[in-house]
C-alpha cells in the first residue's frame, strides 16, 4: 500500500481563518456562512458578508443596478419554488431533451448544472498537481472525507469509490507525475469518483430520487493534451463494449484512457472502465429494486473528463448496467462542460437509440469543444458527411448544447486566450448569469465570481482578485518537531478493490451467470 497525505494536518505557523460558502445545495439568497480553516477548504471562495460587499454586489451596483439584480433573483427563486426538483427531476435529467428549459433558462436546470459542475470541479480541487510532491497524481483526501475536506457540507452524497487510470498511454500532457523517486504509484493517476446520494430525508426530499453520480477529472486550463490525441477513430466493440454495430467508433485516445490497465499496479490493475461499471452495478443492485425507490445515473466531467463522461454514460447503457434485476430501466444522463467530440455519427446515433441523454455546456470561444474533427463534423453538409462517414477522422457531437459567451459577462476580461476560455469555474460563472439568448447577464444565485480566478487570470483587474489564488498555506509544507519544513505524510490510500469485483465483471460479460 502507498501512503497518501491527510490534509487535516495544518502548518504550525498558520492561524488564518476564512469564511466560505459551502454546499452542493442550490441557493438563491445570501449564502450561509460557516467558518473553516482556509487550508481545509480550497473548493470555495469567500462569500458575501454584512461588513463588506462582494465584488458581485459592487458590480451589480455599477453595471445594472442592485434592484434589477435582486428582482431577477427573486423571480428565479419564485419560479424554483413553484417547480421543485423533486417533482421535475426527469425533465431536468433530459427526459424531453431539455425542450423549453434553456431559452429562457429554467432556474432549476441552471441550479443542477452548477451543482454537477461543482462535482467535476471537486476533482480539480482535490487533485495533487505538484510535481515536487511525492503524492503527485493522487487525490489529496480520503474518499470518506473528500467533500468535508473541500469545505463542502451538506452535499447529500457519499463517495462510494475512487477511480484510477494507468498513465502508460500516449497522453503525456494529461497525467501528472512526481519528481520523487519513491512515489505512491509510478503508473497511476486519480481520475475521479463514484458517489451516491445518501439516506438523509432532506436529500431524498430535495432530489426526488436516489442519484448515482460519476465525476471525471479533466484538465484545468492546459490544452497541450489535445495535440496528444491521435485523432483516429476505432470501433468500440474491439474494447470490450457489447456493441452490435462495428461501425460505432470513438477516438482512440479516449478509449485507451478508459479501457487500459496495468496489472503490475494495485491502483490500475483494473481499468477505469471496469472500476466504473462494477461500482455502478453494485449500487444498482443495492438500490434499484427497493420499493418506492427511484434511481438516476448522472455522469459529469470537464474537458477530457467530459469525453470520459460521455463514453462511460454510453457504456453503462450499452452494457445494461442501468437495468435492475426486475428489468426497470434507470435513466442515464451526462452533463459535460467544455467537452470535446468523442465519436462518429454512428456513435451519436447509438447513444440516442440507447436513450442516454447528454447536455453539453460550452463557451463559444473554447477550442476544445470544437475538437477533434475540426473540418469533418456534424456541421458539415449532410451529403459530405454521408460520403466521409467511414473515414477515421470524421466526428460528431452528441446530445444537446448550451452555448455561453464569456464576453457577455461584465465580470470577465474580453480575452481571446484559448486556455482561459476553457476554464470550468468560468463556465459555472457564466451559467449563473445566463437567462436566455439576448437577455442581460445577471448572477442568479450569488455564486462568488472570485472563484473564476482560482486557477486563471480571467476577472477584470479592478475587482482586485489575485489570479491563480487557490493554493495551500506554505504550499503544503509543515514544521516538524525539530522545526524543519517537511511534507507531511498522508493517510494510506485504499488501493484494495472490492473483493467481489471479479464476480461482478463475470456477470457483466456473461449476464446469464447473474445470481
UniProtKB/Swiss-Prot annotation:
Catalytic activity reads:
1,2-dihexadecanoyl-sn-glycero-3-phosphocholine + H2O = 2-hexadecanoyl-sn-glycero-3-phosphocholine + hexadecanoate + H(+); a 1,2-diacyl-3-O-(beta-D-galactosyl)-sn-glycerol + H2O = an acyl-3-O-(beta-D-galactosyl)-sn-glycerol + a fatty acid + H(+); a 1,2-diacyl-3-O-[alpha-D-galactosyl-(1->6)-beta-D-galactosyl]-sn-glycerol + H2O = acyl-3-O-[alpha-D-galactosyl-(1->6)-beta-D-galactosyl]-sn-glycerol + a fatty acid + H(+)
EC number(s) recorded for this UniProt protein: 3.1.1.-
Location comes to:
Plastid, Chloroplast
What tissue expression does the UniProt record report for this protein?
A: Ubiquitous. Highly expressed in leaves.
Coiled-coil annotation reads none
Q: Name one Pfam family in it.
A: Lipase_3
Which terms does the record give in the GO molecular function aspect? galactolipase activity; phospholipase A1 activity; triacylglycerol lipase activity
Upregulation: Not induced by wounding. Induced by wounding.
**What is the reported phenotype of gene knockout?**
No visible phenotype under standard growth phenotype. Decreased dinor-12-oxo-phytodienoic acid (dnOPDA) formation.
Per UniProt, the short sequence motif GXSXG occupies residue numbers 301-305
InterPro entries per the record? AB_hydrolase_fold (IPR029058), Fungal_lipase-type (IPR002921)
One GO term (biological process): lipid catabolic process
Transit peptide located at: 1-44
Q: What GO cellular-component annotations does this UniProt entry give?
A: chloroplast
UniProt xrefs under Gene3D superfamilies: alpha/beta hydrolase
Record key words, sorted:
Chloroplast, Hydrolase, Lipid degradation, Lipid metabolism, Plastid, Transit peptide
Main location per the UniProt record: plastid
Residues annotated as the enzyme's active site? 303 (acyl-ester intermediate), 366 (charge relay system), 422 (charge relay system)
Q: Which family does it belong to?
A: Belongs to the AB hydrolase superfamily. Lipase family.
Q: Write out the function statement from the record.
A: Acylhydrolase with a broad specificity. Catalyzes the hydrolysis of phosphatidylcholine at the sn-1 position. Moderate activity toward phosphatidylcholine (PC), monogalactosyldiacylglycerol (MGDG), digalactosyldiacylglycerol (DGDG) and triacylglycerol (TAG). May display dual sn-1/sn-2 substrate specificity. Could be involved in early wound response.
Q: What name goes with this protein?
A: Phospholipase A1-Igamma1, chloroplastic
Write down the species.
Arabidopsis thaliana
Amino acid at each position: 500500500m502507498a501512503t497518501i497525505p491527510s490534509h487535516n494536518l495544518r502548518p504550525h505557523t498558520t492561524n488564518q481563518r476564512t469564511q466560505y460558502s459551502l454546499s452542493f445545495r442550490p441557493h438563491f439568497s445570501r449564502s450561509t456562512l460557516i467558518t473553516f480553516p482556509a487550508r481545509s477548504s480550497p473548493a470555495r471562495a469567500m462569500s458575501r458578508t454584512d461588513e463588506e460587499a462582494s465584488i458581485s454586489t459592487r458590480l451589480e451596483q455599477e453595471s445594472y443596478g442592485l434592484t434589477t439584480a435582486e428582482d431577477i433573483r427573486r423571480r428565479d427563486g419564485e419560479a424554483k419554488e413553484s417547480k421543485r426538483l423533486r417533482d421535475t427531476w426527469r425533465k431536468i435529467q433530459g427526459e424531453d431533451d431539455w425542450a423549453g428549459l434553456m431559452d429562457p433558462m429554467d432556474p432549476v436546470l441552471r441550479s443542477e448544472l452548477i451543482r454537477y459542475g461543482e462535482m467535476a470541479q471537486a476533482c480539480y480541487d482535490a487533485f495533487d498537481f505538484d510535481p515536487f510532491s511525492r503524492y503527485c497524481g493522487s487525490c489529496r483526501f480520503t474518499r470518506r472525507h473528500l467533500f468535508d475536506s473541500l469545505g463542502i457540507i451538506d452535499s447529500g452524497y457519499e463517495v462510494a469509490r475512487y477511480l484510477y487510470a494507468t498513465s502508460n498511454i500516449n497522453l503525456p500532457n494529461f497525467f501528472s507525475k512526481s519528481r520523487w523517486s519513491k512515489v505512491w504509484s509510478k503508473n497511476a493517476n486519480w481520475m475521479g469518483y463514484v458517489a451516491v446520494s445518501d439516506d438523509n430525508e432532506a436529500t431524498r426530499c430535495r432530489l426526488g430520487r436516489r442519484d448515482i453520480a460519476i465525476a471525471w477529472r479533466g484538465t484545468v486550463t492546459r490544452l497541450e493534451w489535445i495535440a496528444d490525441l491521435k485523432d483516429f477513430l476505432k470501433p468500440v466493440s474491439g474494447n470490450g463494449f457489447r456493441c452490435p454495430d462495428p461501425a460505432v467508433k470513438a477516438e482512440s485516445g479516449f478509449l485507451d484512457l478508459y479501457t487500459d490497465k496495468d496489472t503490475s499496479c494495485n491502483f490500475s490493475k483494473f481499468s477505469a472502465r471496469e472500476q466504473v461499471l462494477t461500482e455502478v452495478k453494485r449500487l444498482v443492485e443495492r438500490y434499484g429494486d427497493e420499493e418506492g425507490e427511484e434511481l438516476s445515473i448522472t455522469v459529469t466531467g470537464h474537458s477530457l473528463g467530459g469525453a470520459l463522461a460521455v463514453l462511460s454514460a454510453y457504456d453503462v447503457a450499452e452494457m445494461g448496467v442501468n437495468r435492475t434485476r426486475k428489468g426497470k430501466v434507470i435513466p442515464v444522463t451526462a452533463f459535460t462542460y467544455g467537452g470535446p467530440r468523442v465519436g462518429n455519427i454512428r456513435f451519436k446515433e447509438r447513444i440516442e437509440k440507447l436513450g442516454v441523454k447528454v447536455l453539453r455546456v460550452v463557451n463559444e470561444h473554447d477550442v476544445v469543444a470544437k475538437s477533434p474533427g475540426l473540418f469533418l463534423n456534424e456541421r458539415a453538409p449532410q451529403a459530405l458527411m454521408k460520403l466521409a462517414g467511414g473515414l477515421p477522422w470524421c466526428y460528431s457531437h452528441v446530445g444537446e448544447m448550451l452555448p455561453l459567451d464569456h464576453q457577455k459577462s461584465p465580470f470577465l476580461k474580453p480575452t481571446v486566450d484559448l486556455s482561459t476560455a476553457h476554464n470550468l469555474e468560468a463556465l459555472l460563472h457564466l451559467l449563473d448569469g445566463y437567462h436566455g439568448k439576448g437577455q442581460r447577464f445577471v448572477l442568479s444565485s450569488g455564486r462568488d465570481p472570485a472563484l473564476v480566478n482560482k486557477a486563471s487570470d480571467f476577472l477584470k483587474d479592478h475587482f482586485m482578485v489575485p489570479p491563480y489564488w487557490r493554493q495551500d498555506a506554505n504550499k503544503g509544507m509543515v514544521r516538524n518537531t525539530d522545526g524543519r519544513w517537511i511534507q507531511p505524510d498522508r493517510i494510506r490510500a485504499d488501493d484494495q478493490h472490492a473483493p467481489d469485483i471479479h464476480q461482478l465483471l463475470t456477470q457483466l460479460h456473461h449476464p446469464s451467470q447473474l445470481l
